[in-house]
């Protein structure tokens, strides 16, 4: 006993226990936010109006959707990345006529290519 406290010791029995005691602790798996349909639709509509919202627009989306601002910001980043990959794939399909190993996207790719000619990236 030290300072009125009882000291407890754990005996390590095996080599596995010794190795485990030196392993770094893993972080618990991060939970994901599940968006409702109305939240997704509102974010999509906002994205169509402006893919690069400023802080005030993000704050307004936070107030409307109750999605944390950090998640709104990340949603827009991910959405722009997805849009860019659609565009790049559409340009490739349009240029080559088909994509090796993938089925053609057809008219959808042409629509993306036309739409993105006028967007800034």
UniProtKB/Swiss-Prot annotation:
Predominant localisation class: nucleus
InterPro entries: HD, Homeodomain-like_sf
Alphabetic keyword roster: DNA-binding, Homeobox, Nucleus
Pfam families associated with the record: Homeodomain
GO molecular function, one term: DNA binding
DNA-binding segment(s): 28-87
UniProt keyword Acyltransferase, yes or no: no
DNA-binding recorded as keyword: yes
GO cellular component: nucleus
Protein name, UniProt field: Homeobox protein HD-6
Subcellular localization(s) per the UniProt record: Nucleus
């Amino acid at each position: 006993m030290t300072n009125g406290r009882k000291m407890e010791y754990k005996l390590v029995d095996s080599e596995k226990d010794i190795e485990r005691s030196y392993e770094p602790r893993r972080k618990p798996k991060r939970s994901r936010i599940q968006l409702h349909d109305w939240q997704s639709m509102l974010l999509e509509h906002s994205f169509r109006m402006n893919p690069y919202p400023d802080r005030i627009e993000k704050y307004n989306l936070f107030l409307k959707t109750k999605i944390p601002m950090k998640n709104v910001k990340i949603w827009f980043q991910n959405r722009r990345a997805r849009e860019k990959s659609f565009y790049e794939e559409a340009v490739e399909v349009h240029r080559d006529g088909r994509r090796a190993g993938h089925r053609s996207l057809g008219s959808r790719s042409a629509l993306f290519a036309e739409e993105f000619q006028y967007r800034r990236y």
